[in-house]
């Protein structure tokens, strides 16, 4: 899985601080400046920050809730859980700080791309659950789609992003159902 790849890549890093980005993710000058300050001060072991999911060519509304990610961390304090086949994140033993800066993720250029990713990730996630002997629940299958839609569309305020927010919320609900 991806966790093993990321653990191996981290072992090859020659610097203490590791920035974990995918090929479709881009930093801006403001977040880079924040990283430099945090590294200079050296009072944290990891940094959590916001992600702009650029969907069909546009960033989400400023009123929509953005996901946050732990992507900058000290190599000596971090590891990955190799049983995670998808949505892996570093596990850091130390002080975490949050900065109110964001990076852009260009992974969802069209509805077909987001659908393909939902199918790919849900297959990996269901394999992961199978390997851990997790059983499915009929009640959960019945409830997960509508509850995920309510959470993403209303509580995460995706409705502020118009049709893109509606499509994104439906895709998130579909993913939650199929995994």
Predicted features, each with a name:
Residues 1, 25:
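Alpha/beta-hydrolase active-site loop signature
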Residues 21-23, 30:
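Active-site acidic Asp-centered loop
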Residues 15:
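Active-site-proximal cofactor/substrate-binding loop regions of enzyme domains
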Residues 18:
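Short aromatic/hydrophobic "clamp" motif used to bind/position activated sugar donors
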Residues 4, 10, 28-179:
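Catalytic-site signature of metal-activated, phosphate-bearing donor transferases
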